Amino acid sequence: MADSLAPVRRANIIGVGLIGGSIALGLREIGWHVTGEDRDPATNALAIELAVLDKIGFDADAEITFVATPVGAVVEAAQRALAASTGVVT
């Protein structure tokens, strides 16, 4: 569990399917604040309902962004994340 005096660590997830959702859940379990988005609005709604994500969108100040999109969308998603983020994009 995260130390309550430590700053909250923040991450982005782009693509909240099986892989992205699993990463998000793992991060949330250890106390990270996770912002994310999926191309499917229904997936976004479900991710909030099931507490997979804390928030829908993109946190430009997150320390890391995980790109978990289908292969054909990786380049565009990574380019957008790199342009909008000050953190690591993987």
Language model features: what each stretch is:
Residues M1-A2, T90:
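A broadly tuned preference for mixed-charge, low-complexity surface segments
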Residues A2-I56:
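NAD(P)+-binding Rossmann beta1-loop-alpha1 motif at the extreme N-terminus of oxidoreductases
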Residues G36, V89-T90:
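Generic enzyme active-site microenvironment
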Residues F58-V89:
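Rossmann-like NAD(P)-binding element
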